[in-house]
Regions:
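The conserved cystathionine-beta-synthase
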Residues: 19-36, 42-44, 93-111, 117-118, ...
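Residue-level recognition of oxygen-bearing side chains
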Residues: 24, 58, 99, 122, ...
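Short hydrophobic beta-strand motif reused across regulatory alpha/beta modules
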Residues: 38, 51-59, 113, 118, ...
Length: 139
């Protein structure tokens, strides 16, 4: 029997899919759909964290919402816009050594679905609400 996870490093997903800030939103949409990913950290050319895009951000992208022309218009806009135009630049982060209880409280307080895990300036992983659900389900 495995010991119960205590720290972020014990529960996080270490192999994080990231995308460059200059990629088109259509690429982000494809990566998220095909990889069944809901949160995608966005990086600068040097690999440092620049922002985050969620499925909700893609769906509610300001221009798409304003246009309201349906799925065809949405597909066209995803081809035209870059990730940097839809990403959130204020990313809530944590460290691998943060206790899981603190991380969970932070997610609840900030009403967010994930924390990007940084080890120094390097992305070490991602911790999502899905990770917590799995933890509870597995007992």
């Amino acid at each position: 029997m495995n010991p119960r996870p205590t720290f972020v490093r014990d529960l996080m997903t270490p192999d994080v899919v990231t995308l460059d800030r200059n990629e088109k939103l259509v690429v982000a949409d494809d990566v998220m759909r095909l990889g069944r990913i809901r949160h995608l950290p966005i990086v600068d050319s040097d690999g440092s964290l620049a922002g985050i895009v969620s499925q909700r951000d893609l769906f509610h992208s300001g221009l798409l919402k304003a246009l309201g022309y349906g799925t065809h218009a949405q597909a066209n806009m995803l081809d035209l816009l870059s990730v940097k135009e839809a990403m959130k630049t204020e990313v809530v982060t944590t460290t691998p050594d943060t206790p899981l209880v603190e991380a969970a409280k932070l997610m609840i307080e900030r009403k967010i679905g994930c924390l990007v895990v940084l080890d120094g300036q390097k992305i070490a992983g991602i911790l999502t609400e899905g990770d917590f659900v799995k933890l509870v389900a597995e007992g």
